[in-house]
């Protein structure tokens, strides 16, 4: 937000000139009610003790300095115990249009991240079956967060961790092997916890057709072959489903590579040398209680098998070795209890707490016409992400996933999401962009020319309250993006876009654009709409949602 940046810089200079230190509790906010200026600052209240002055007296002193320093300010009111309510000129707000025109697709970007290297890991579902709708929410959050952080000046790398080691993988191979025998008419005993979905039968049938001698193998070799083929097949399907959902992972990282490459043992040795790993009852333990965990954790069981935690520690060690300043893991909410031990591991690796963060993804309750759809991957009862995207479209699904805070449960009604009405959030926002494009097209058809470059004087007729409201809202875009990146909260963007769309729809309903009686307001209003369209398009792009020009 240009206004907030400008006011902050001016206040910091004033405080410095007073020979005082900038207080940590100083804030600059947008007043929720009208009549209290464009911005409100509490600087006099939190600086009064240090300055040895009454807050209102100090506020008067600061206000006088502000008036002399910033010509864009038209009014400063001192409210209550000493709040500064600052109002900027209409010329100042109209310049938002010029900045949007100049920046185009970069409008709203910033250097907030200052090139900080960030890795975002998301989805990372076991390659034991197709992605379901819950994975889709994590995919939308992770992919959008990466887009937002890049736009805010971070150097972001995205990654999918392939869980291709451990019990679930052995169970996948066994499930396909048993189904292959069953398809061949051989007597089988179905394991209690095997994967039951029809996709397992399909994989078994496909493999038998490609390799007629499959069942000549003994059980161990057969299970290994079935595992390798099934994992490759399922992973290919996952990659395609994500591509169709407009989700990109730059790196696909194998868990097995950590084990076979010696990274896990290397991490064990590192922890032992630091006195943080110890043997007890034939097992290897990690002393996570030294870092605030409620109990120590097993790394290697007494039978020699590795825990998931051991690979995860080695994996994060690898991440930091690759030079990332911040590692962001996006996990299902059922992994909440895993966070303390992972933070302990990061600390044991010698990393600062701020180098690691977790975004939790709450469950998605899939509904169809208000009726809950039961889901279980192992039982083969689930709505795949591919089916959902095919039915609703990627735009609607992504926007719906991003419409609420990620750690809040989400009801996803397939029938509601498909509606092309203003009750559907994605339609509401996309229609606002299409409406802007429609007006601009009609203007061109009527021979109304939009200058390639506008200037402040040509925009002067924009002076209405609703126009100033729109301009102040557009000015907030950069701040909203930066805040979403810092808070790891993509839903901030969807909420903001709903607000912009609402303001645009209201403005369109109240103010004539092409048929305005005052001819001198037509081009300025078109320029305002074009700036709104720029913000809507840029914001939707950050969510991985299209900005249609007609609907």
Curated annotation (Swiss-Prot):
SMART domains: Arg_tRNA_synt_N (SM01016), DALR_1 (SM00836). One of its GO terms (biological process) is arginyl-tRNA aminoacylation. InterPro entries: aa-tRNA-synth_I_CS, Arg-tRNA-ligase, Arg-tRNA-synth_N, Arg-tRNA-synth_N_sf, ArgRS_core, DALR_anticod-bd, Rossmann-like_a/b/a_fold, tRNAsynth_Ia_anticodon-bd. Its main location: cytoplasm. It comes from the Bacteria. It is found in: Cytoplasm. A motif ('HIGH' region) lies at residues 125-135. Keywords: Aminoacyl-tRNA synthetase, ATP-binding, Cytoplasm, Ligase, Nucleotide-binding, Protein biosynthesis. It catalyses: tRNA(Arg) + L-arginine + ATP = L-arginyl-tRNA(Arg) + AMP + diphosphate. Belongs to the class-I aminoacyl-tRNA synthetase family. NCBIfam families: argS. This is Arginine--tRNA ligase. The gene is argS.
């Amino acid at each position: 937000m240009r206004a907030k940046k400008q006011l902050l810089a001016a206040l910091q200079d004033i405080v410095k000139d007073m020979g005082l230190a900038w207080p940590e509790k100083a804030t600059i906010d947008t007043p929720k009610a009208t009549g209290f200026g464009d911005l409100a600052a509490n600087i006099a209240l939190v600086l009064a003790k240090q300055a040895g002055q009454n807050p209102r007296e100090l506020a008067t002193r600061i206000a006088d300095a502000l008036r002399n320093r910033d010509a864009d300010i038209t009014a400063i009111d001192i409210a209550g115990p000493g709040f500064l309510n600052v109002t900027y000129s209409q010329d100042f707000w109209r310049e938002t249009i010029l900045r949007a025109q100049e920046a185009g697709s970069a409008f709203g970007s910033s250097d907030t991240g200052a090139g900080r290297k960030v890795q975002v890991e998301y989805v990372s579902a076991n390659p034991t079956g197709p992605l379901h709708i819950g994975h889709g929410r994590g995919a939308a959050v992770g992919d959008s967060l990466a887009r937002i952080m890049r736009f805010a000046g971070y150097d972001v790398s995205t990654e999918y961790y392939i869980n291709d080691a451990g019990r679930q993988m052995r169970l996948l191979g066994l499930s396909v092997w048993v189904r292959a025998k069953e398809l061949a008419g051989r007597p089988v005993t179905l394991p209690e916890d095997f994967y039951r979905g029809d996709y397992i039968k399909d994989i078994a049938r496909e493999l038998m057709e490609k390799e007629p001698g499959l069942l000549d193998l003994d059980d161990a070799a057969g299970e290994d072959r079935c595992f390798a083929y099934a994992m490759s097949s399922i992973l290919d399907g996952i990659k395609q489903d994500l591509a169709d959902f407009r989700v990109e992972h730059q790196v696909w990282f194998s868990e097995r590579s950590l084990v076979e490459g010696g990274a896990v043992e290397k991490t064990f040795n590192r922890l032992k040398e630091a006195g943080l790993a110890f043997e007890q009852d034939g097992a290897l333990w990690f002393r996570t209680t030294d870092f605030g965990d409620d109990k120590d954790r097993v790394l290697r069981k007494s039978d020699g098998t590795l825990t998931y935690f051991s690979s995860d520690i080695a994996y994060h060690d690898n991440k930091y070795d690759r030079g990332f300043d911040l590692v962001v893991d996006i996990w299902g909410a059922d992994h909440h209890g895993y966070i303390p031990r992972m933070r302990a591991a990061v600390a044991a690796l010698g990393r600062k707490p701020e180098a690691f963060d977790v975004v939790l993804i709450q469950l998605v309750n899939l509904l169809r016409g208000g009726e809950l759809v039961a889901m279980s991957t192992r039982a083969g009862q689930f709505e795949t992400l591919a089916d959902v995207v095919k039915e609703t479209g990627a735009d609607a699904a992504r926007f719906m996933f991003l419409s609420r805070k990620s750690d809040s449960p989400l009801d996803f009604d397939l029938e509601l999401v498909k509606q092309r009405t203003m009750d559907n959030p994605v339609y509401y926002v996309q229609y606002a962009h299409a409406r802007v494009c429609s007006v601009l097209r009609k203007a061109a058809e009527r021979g109304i020319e939009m200058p390639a470059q506008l200037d402040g004087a040509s925009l002067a007729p924009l002076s209405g309250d609703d126009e100033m409201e729109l301009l102040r809202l557009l000015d907030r875009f950069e701040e909203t993006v930066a805040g979403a990146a810092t808070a790891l909260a993509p839903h901030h963007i969807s909420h903001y876009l709903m607000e912009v769309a609402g303001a645009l729809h209201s403005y369109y309903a109240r103010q004539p654009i092409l048929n305005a009686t005052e001819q001198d307001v037509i081009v300025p209003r078109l320029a305002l709409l074009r700036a709104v369209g720029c913000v809507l398009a840029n914001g939707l792009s950050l969510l991985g949602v299209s900005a249609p020009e007609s609907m």
